[in-house]
Amino acid sequence: MSSGRIVQIIGAVIDVEFPRDSVPAVYDALKVESKGLTLEVQQQLGDGIVRCIAMGSSEGLSRNLEVTGTGAPVSVPVGNETLGRIMDVLGNPIDECGPIGEQERMPIHRKAPAYDELSSTTDLLETGVKVIDLVCPFAKGGKVGLFGGAGVGKTVNMMELINNIALEHSGLSVFAGVGERTREGNDFYHEMQESGVVNVENFKESKVAMVYGQMNEPPGNRLRVALTGLTMAEKFRDEGRDVLLFIDNIYRYTLAGTEVSALLGRMPSAVGYQPTLAEEMGVLQERITSTKTGSITSVQAVYVPADDLTDPSPATTFAHLDSTVVLSRDIAAKGIYPAIDPLDSTSRQLDPLVIGAEHYDVARGVQSVLQRYKELKDIIAILGMDELSEEDKQTVNRARKIERFLSQPFHVAEVFTGAPGKYVPLKDTIAGFKGLLAGDFDHLPEQAFYMVGTIDEAVEKAAKIAGKAA
């Protein structure tokens, strides 16, 4: 075990001098025993000096403090003992429920699986959310991104997906909270307890492991917490299980990288991001993959700064995903939730050979009606509905019904809306939209389609509205 001394401290970045014959490797963990702080080596500057980022607050550090090399990267607990527990970036428990008691620890830095170990699948993962299952279906073992600006519902959508998939799919989940609100992490933990996914009495019966590096943490924690969660998911995958990995929020991972990059003295690139943005994103995303042993299905929330999808951070993330769910402020402004844009959201699974001709035709039919309505909006704004042809009037009426039918009450939003949540099976979703496109429900009022589950509920709601009017 080599030991060195701190020679410089700039915020979260700390330079440590070691004897020249025992300089630690890049990504090695170093310990400041007197402060209980872990550092991670980022650069070797020469002359025995290494530049590190602190995995915690650097307050109270001073020059000449002794630092010990561990000779290995940061390692975290893995395996069944992590289930039901909340851990920080170093794998320490933060839920006040005693030690983890792990049998095994693994380093957070690993190589991605080799090309010949990868497996691809075209099995669909039903989410019970109509708009997702219809226009941007998820693949089992695929990667999904939830893109949206501030306050359009990324976290609520993710919570609903956790509720629907993690409860319906009896497998294991790992939740990594990267630079998000502590309050949301707390709410999530209590919701998981209420739904039985976390069993505090008997952790062995829990189905989710949680790793948090929240907004108030130093950039080193936020930068590495995604890797900590991923390492736990990889262990479950390598045991031959199907794992769900939820990351909220990938943008904060990029942002932590930007903060660290500037402190490490790198020249910034476009919009002030780190020059290694694509590489850092690739290192994380290439490890989130399914192998012939087991699968990782990941759902990642991606904050879009100033609603600009061309910003380098979301733009870099797009390349790695199988399905992109884009949340729109315009749709949220209409009161339609989930505020998912059916024209902007895409999926590689939307192919007749994968999902079948009927599903494909209905999805494309819905998109073409909504696209035509979008084109007609300018004409309607200037000349009004009366100037449209009969065919266009019919398209507009159907599009407005489809728009409303894409809304749905969520289980996790029940406390706010008072409306019980709905899980809609895929076959019911396809049947409902097929009927709308065929004109079977042209006689029903628009409001009957708002915030209902299946088409039968819309018909019931229309009857109630008609009864009240009478």
From Swiss-Prot:
GO cellular component: plasma membrane; proton-transporting ATP synthase complex
Keyword Translocase among UniProt keywords: yes
SUPFAM superfamilies referenced in this protein's UniProt entry, alphabetically: C-terminal domain of alpha and beta subunits of F1 ATP synthase, N-terminal domain of alpha and beta subunits of F1 ATP synthase, P-loop containing nucleoside triphosphate hydrolases
Subcellular location(s) of the protein: Cell inner membrane
Residue numbers binding ATP: G148, G149, A150, G151, V152, G153, K154, T155
Main subcellular location: membrane
Any Pfam family: ATP-synt_ab_N
EC number: 7.1.2.2
UniProt cross-references to SMART domains, sorted A to Z: AAA
Keyword tags: ATP synthesis, ATP-binding, Cell inner membrane, Cell membrane, CF(1), Hydrogen ion transport, Ion transport, Membrane, Nucleotide-binding, Translocase, Transport
Family note: Belongs to the ATPase alpha/beta chains family.
Role noted for this protein: Produces ATP from ADP in the presence of a proton gradient across the membrane. The catalytic sites are hosted primarily by the beta subunits.
Known partners and oligomeric status: F-type ATPases have 2 components, CF(1) - the catalytic core - and CF(0) - the membrane proton channel. CF(1) has five subunits: alpha(3), beta(3), gamma(1), delta(1), epsilon(1). CF(0) has three main subunits: a(1), b(2) and c(9-12). The alpha and beta chains form an alternating ring which encloses part of the gamma chain. CF(1) is attached to CF(0) by a central stalk formed by the gamma and epsilon chains, while a peripheral stalk is formed by the delta and b chains.
UniProt-recorded name of the protein: ATP synthase subunit beta
Organism (species): Teredinibacter turnerae (strain ATCC 39867 / T7901)
